[in-house]
Amino acid sequence: MDLSKTRVIPSNALESGGSAPAGRRYGGVDKDERQRQRRDKLIQAGLAVFGEKGFHAATVRNVCHHAELTSRYFYESFESMEALFEGVYVHVSSELMRRTVTALQASPMVPDLLAETALRAFLEYIREDPHRARVALIDALTVGAGASRISNESNKDFARLIATFIEMLYPTLAADTGLDPIYVANGLVGSNIRIATVWVEEKCATPLEVVLRNMFAFYQASISYADARLKEAQASKAQPTA
C-alpha cells in the first residue's frame, strides 16, 4: 500500500479560495509568495504564542509582535484568532501525520514494531516542542466549533491509518471475530490522546521510554486479543462438522 496517499487535512484548508494575480515582484519574490511567507510566519508565531500563553490569553498583538508583522498582515491571512488557531492546528496535525507515515514506511510489517514506531514518532514530535501538544491536545477542545471539528477530523484520520494497518495485518479479523478495525483504532487513538495529555500537563517530566511503554501496552493487549480470537476462529473452522 502506498502510504504517501494517506489523507491529511490540507495545509491550505482554511485559506480562501482563488488566487490573486501575481502582482509586482520584490527581490525576485511575487505577491502571492510574499503573502504565503507572511502566513507561514504567523502560523509559527501562533504556535509559539498559543503554546506559551494558551489560546484564551493570546492576542493579535502578541502574535504580530512574535512574527514581526503588523496587524494589517494578520488580517490579510486570518479573519480572527480562532481562524489562526485552526491554521496552527492543521499545521501541527499535518506535520505529525507526515512524520508518522514516513516512520511507518521504514518499519517492518510486524504488528508490535509498527505500533512502537508510530507511538515513538508521536511522542518525539510532542517532546521536540510541547507547544504542539498544548494546541492539539488541550486548547483545541475549548476554542470553538471550528477547532473542535478540525480536531475530530484529525483524530479520524489517525484512526483510519491504524485501521488500515489492522486490515492489512489481519485481513479476516472482522469476518472471523466480529472485531471492527475502525472501532479498535478509535479506541487506540483515544488512549494515545489521554496519555499524551497527562504527559504534557506534567511538562513531559516522565521519561519518554516510560510513557511509550505504557502507551504501547494498549496496543500489545489489542494485538494479543486479536491473535487469540483468530486462533479460536481457526480452531473452530478446523473442527469436523457432525
Identify the role of each PLM range.
Residues G87, T102-H131:
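Hydrophobic alpha-helical connector segments
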Residues D2-S19, D176-E201, E209-S222:
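Hydrophobic alpha-helical segments that form the core
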Residues E128-G146, A163-I166, T197:
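Amphipathic alpha-helical segments used for helix-helix packing
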Residues K41, V49-A83:
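Helix-turn-helix
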Residues R34-G46, V63, V88-L96:
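Generic hydrophobic, amphipathic alpha-helix propensity
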Residues A58, N62, F78, A83-E95, ...:
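Alpha-helical DNA-contacting segments of helix-turn-helix folds
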Residues M1-Q37, D227-A242:
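N-terminal intrinsically disordered/low-complexity leader segments
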Residues S94, G146-P171, I182-I193, V210-R213, ...:
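Amphipathic alpha-helical packing segments from all-alpha helical-bundle domains
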